[in-house]
C-alpha cells in the first residue's frame, strides 16, 4: 500500500526506471542518459499533466528502488511541487511490479465503485483536456472497456529550430491508453498486456470525434517509435508550438530533444521512379482513374 496519497478516480502509470523491461537495455542511471530522460519527462510529459483543466487524478511514477539517492531527491522534489504526482520505488522484479499494480487500488477514490487507470510513456504528452475526457467514462456501463484517443502527433527534431510533425492514426497507441475498472474486480491498464493488442483483447472506445491527440516524441532512445518523414510537415519551433496549441497541447518544450541529422538515403519510391519510363507512369495513372 502506498501511504499518504491523494486519492482520485483516475490514476495513471509511468514505468520510468524499473529494470525489467525489454531485457538488456541501457543503464537508466548513467549520468548523461539520466539527465536527458529527466529533462524530457519534466518539460514534456509532466508539463502536459500540469496543464490539465481537470486536476482530479493521480500520476504514479514506477522507479527502481536502486535509484541513486541524489536522483531520488530530484523526483521527490517534483512530487512536492505537483500534488498529483507520486513516486513508487519497487524492486527490479516482475513480482514487485505486479504487487505495485495490485496495491494501487488503495490509492483509488472509486466513484460509484468505478475508476479508470491509464498509461503513458515518460517522453510523451497528452492534450490539456485528457483527464476531463476520461472522466465522462467513470460509469458502470463502461467497466471492462478500454479507451483510446487514436490520433497521434509524432515530433522529431531535425535542426536547432526545426521539427518534423506527422499526424498518425493508431487506435491502440500507448499515449493515455485507459481502462475502466471497478472495486470488485480491480484491474489496471498495465495488466492488459501489450498495448497494441488492447483493441483485440477488450472492447474499445475510440474518441475519434476529438480534434486532438497525444504527442509522441522521437528522441533518439525510443527505438521502437518511428516516423514516416514523407508524411511529415516541417515546422520551426514557434510554428510547432502554435500548431499544438490549437490541439490543446500547451506549455511543453521540445528543446531538450536530440537533433536527428537528415538521413543520407533515397527512398525506394524515388529510386524506382528513376527507372520507370514516362509512358508507363501515364498508363498507370489512367488505369487508376478507371477505379
Please give the residue ranges for each predicted region.
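C-terminal catalytic/acceptor-binding lobe
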Residues: 4, 177-291
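Active-site-proximal specificity loops/subdomain of glycosyltransferases
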Residues: 23-31, 36, 61-116
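Short, acidic, metal-binding catalytic loop of nucleotide-sugar glycosyltransferases
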Residues: 29-33, 44-56, 82
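Conserved catalytic core of nucleotide-sugar-dependent glycosyltransferases
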Residues: 95-110, 127-205
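Acidic metal-phosphate-binding loop of nucleotide-sugar-dependent transferases
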Residues: 123-125
Amino acid at each position: 500500500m502506498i501511504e499518504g496519497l491523494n486519492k482520485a478516480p483516475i490514476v495513471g502509470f509511468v514505468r520510468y526506471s524499473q529494470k525489467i523491461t525489454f531485457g538488456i537495455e541501457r543503464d537508466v542511471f548513467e549520468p548523461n542518459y539520466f539527465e536527458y530522460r529527466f529533462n524530457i519527462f519534466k518539460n514534456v510529459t509532466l508539463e502536459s499533466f500540469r496543464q490539465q483543466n481537470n486536476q482530479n487524478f493521480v500520476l504514479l511514477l514506477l522507479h527502481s528502488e536502486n535509484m541513486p539517492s541524489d536522483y531520488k531527491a530530484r523526483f521527490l522534489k517534483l512530487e512536492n511541487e505537483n500534488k498529483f504526482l507520486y513516486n513508487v520505488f519497487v524492486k527490479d522484479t516482475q513480482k514487485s511490479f505486479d504487487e505495485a499494480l495490485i496495491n494501487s487500488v488503495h490509492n483509488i477514490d472509486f466513484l460509484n465503485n468505478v475508476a479508470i487507470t491509464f498509461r503513458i510513456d515518460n517522453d510523451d504528452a497528452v492534450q490539456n483536456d485528457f483527464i476531463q475526457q476520461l472522466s465522462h467514462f467513470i460509469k458502470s456501463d463502461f467497466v471492462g472497456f478500454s479507451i483510446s484517443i487514436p490520433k497521434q502527433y509524432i515530433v522529431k527534431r531535425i535542426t536547432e529550430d526545426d521539427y518534423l510533425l506527422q499526424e498518425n492514426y493508431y487506435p491502440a497507441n500507448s499515449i493515455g491508453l485507459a481502462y475502466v475498472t471497478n472495486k470488485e474486480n480491480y484491474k489496471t491498464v498495465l495488466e492488459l498486456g501489450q498495448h497494441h493488442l488492447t483493441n483485440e483483447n477488450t472492447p474499445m472506445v475510440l474518441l475519434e470525434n476529438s480534434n486532438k491527440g497525444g504527442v509522441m516524441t522521437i528522441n533518439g532512445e525510443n527505438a521502437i517509435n518511428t516516423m514516416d518523414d514523407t508524411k511529415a510537415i516541417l515546422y520551426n519551433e514557434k510554428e510547432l508550438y502554435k500548431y499544438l496549441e490549437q490541439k490543446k497541447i500547451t506549455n511543453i518544450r521540445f528543446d531538450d530533444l536530440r537533433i536527428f541529422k537528415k538521413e543520407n538515403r533515397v527512398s525506394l519510391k524515388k529510386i524506382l521512379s528513376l527507372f520507370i519510363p514516362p509512358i508507363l507512369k501515364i498508363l498507370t495513372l489512367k488505369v487508376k482513374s478507371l477505379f
